Amino acid sequence: MFLQAVTSPISINSLMVLAAYALLGGLYLIVVPLLLYSWMNRRWHCMGKFERLSAYGLVFLFFPGLILFAPFLNLRLNGQGEV
């Protein structure tokens, strides 16, 4: 009953559009940046020049999502911490 009362003024098409925007926003801000971080972390020291160029392009494209996770991820090499 509560769900019907909440969604009655909103049409099903509007809800589908909002769901599509939420899905695309989640992909752009969360899923793809995390996949990009993991891929760059694995491949950073063995990339070729074209692969590195494409990585830079993807960083430019997905920068808002990458900057959201930057304070929480530590991608330093092993042995670069405390002495």
From Swiss-Prot:
Domain of life of the organism encoding this protein: Bacteria
Leader sequence residues: none
Enzyme class: translocase
GO cellular component: plasma membrane-derived thylakoid membrane
Record flagged with keyword Thylakoid: yes
Subcellular location: Cellular thylakoid membrane
Pfam families referenced in this protein's UniProt entry, alphabetically: NdhL (PF10716)
Catalyzed reaction equations: a plastoquinone + NADH + (n+1) H(+)(in) = a plastoquinol + NAD(+) + n H(+)(out); a plastoquinone + NADPH + (n+1) H(+)(in) = a plastoquinol + NADP(+) + n H(+)(out)
Primary location group: membrane
Keywords, ordered alphabetically: Membrane, NAD, NADP, Plastoquinone, Quinone, Thylakoid, Translocase, Transmembrane, Transmembrane helix, Transport
Family: Belongs to the complex I NdhL subunit family.
Protein name stated in the entry: NAD(P)H-quinone oxidoreductase subunit L
